[in-house]
Amino acid sequence: IDVRFMLPSCVPATPMDESGANLDYRAIDSFYDYPRVQGLAEMMNSYGVIHNDPEVVSKIVASQAHHKKIDGHAPGLQGKDLDTYVAAGVYSDHECATMEDALAKLQRGQFIMIREGTAARNLEALAPLLTPQYAERCMFCTDDKHPSDLLEKGHIDYIAREAINKYGVDPIIAVKAACHHASRYFLLNNRGAIAPGYLADFAVIDNFKDFNVEMVFKKGVLYWNNGELRDFEAPQIEEYLDNRAHDTFHVSTLTPDDFRDARQRGVLGMIPGEIITTDNGYADHVDLEKDILKIAVVERHKG
C-alpha cells in the first residue's frame, strides 16, 4: 500500500478547541518537501478564506508555493462567498449534500469528492453526477469510516459497487471515479489506469455485482491470488512511534460532578445520513422523551 498525506489546515479547528498542538503555516511548511505529501487538507475555515485571515492565507500561499493541492470543506457556501473561496485556490470539496451544492462548485471548476462514509452518506444524492457530462471531475471518498464498516462492507470498492448496483451508474464510470479521476486530481499521473508507462498497481475482481477481489498486483508483482497472500517484507515500526501511538490519552479522573451543569446549553439537531446539524434551541437538562441527551468534549492531550 502506498500511503499519501494531506497536511492539516485547521488544527485547532476553532479558537475554542483544545487540540494537541497549534499547527500554523510555519509548523507544517517543511513537510511539503516529503514526496508522499500531496497538499493541504480540507480548508474548513471558509470564513477565514473569504475574509483574508492572515494565518489562513499564509497556509494557502505556502501550499501553492510548493505546487500542491488544496482540498476544500465548505458545505452550503454560495454566491460571491463561494467565488472567493474557489478563487483562493481551493480545488475540491467533499461536503456536498445536494446536487445544487455540487453543481455550483463544479461550475466554478472544483472537483467533487462524492462521500459515502459511516455517518455522512451522500452517494444517493450525488449519483446523478456520475454521467459523461460531470463524472470527469468527480471521485469517491469516505471521509470517516468505522473499522467495522471497512471490514464488513469495504472502502472505495463499496462505493463503486453501490453506485453500479443500487443507483445504475455505468460500471466504467464508477471504476474511473474510484481510481483514475482521484489519481489525476492528486497528480499521481502514472497511477489509476492500466496503460503503457503506468505503474502496474491494480486488482482483478470477479464481477461488478459482487466486487470480490481475486488478484492484487503491486508494481507488476502478484501479491494476492484467490485467497493466498505472497510473502513480503513488512516495514519496521520504530519503537518511539509505537510508544507514542499507545500514549495519547492524558485525562484526569472524571466524576459525575464534572458533567453537571444547570445552565442553558444549545441543542444540536441531527440529520440522518449527514454530519450537518441544525439549531434546535436551548435546554438545561436531559429529556429522554424529546431525545435531548448530553454530550461532552474531554480534553485528552494535557490532562
Give the label of every model feature segment.
Residues 42-99, 116, 120:
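Divalent metal-binding pocket/active-site signature
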Residues 151-168, 172-303:
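Active-site microenvironment of metallo-dependent hydrolases
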Residues 1-3, 34-37, 65-68, 88, ...:
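Short coil/turn connectors at secondary-structure junctions
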Residues 1-69, 133:
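Divalent-metal coordination cores built from histidine and acidic residues
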Residues 3-7, 38-42, 70-72, 92-94, ...:
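Hydrophobic faces of well-ordered beta-strands that scaffold small-molecule active sites
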Residues 81, 87, 91-191, 203-211:
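Active-site-adjacent C-terminal substructures of enzyme catalytic domains
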